[in-house]
Amino acid sequence: MPNFSGNWKMKSSENFEELLKALGVNMMLRKIAVAAA
């Protein structure tokens, strides 16, 4: 598996909440993450 560690800048947050949901992140953490993004 490639090493993806490092600094990343978010280019867009389109469907970000759906991605978090698919990854199994609970609703409260998703709302916080989307608000911060």
Swiss-Prot record:
PROSITE patterns cross-referenced by the UniProt entry: FABP (PS00214)
Classification via InterPro entries: Calycin (IPR012674), Fatty_acid-bd (IPR000463), ILBP (IPR031259)
GO MF annotation: an example: retinol binding
Superkingdom of the source species: Eukaryota
Entry's localization field: Cytoplasm; Endoplasmic reticulum; Nucleus
Tissue: Embryo.
Keywords: Cytoplasm, Endoplasmic reticulum, Nucleus, Retinol-binding, Transport, Vitamin A
GO cellular component, one term: endoplasmic reticulum
Positions of short motif Nuclear localization signal: 21-31
Family annotation (PANTHER family): FATTY ACID BINDING PROTEIN
Entry domain remark: Forms a beta-barrel structure that accommodates hydrophobic ligands in its interior.
Annotated function: Transports retinoic acid to the nucleus. Regulates the access of retinoic acid to the nuclear retinoic acid receptors.
Family recorded in the similarity comment: Belongs to the calycin superfamily. Fatty-acid binding protein (FABP) family.
Name this polypeptide is given: Cellular retinoic acid-binding protein 2
Organism for this UniProt entry: Gallus gallus
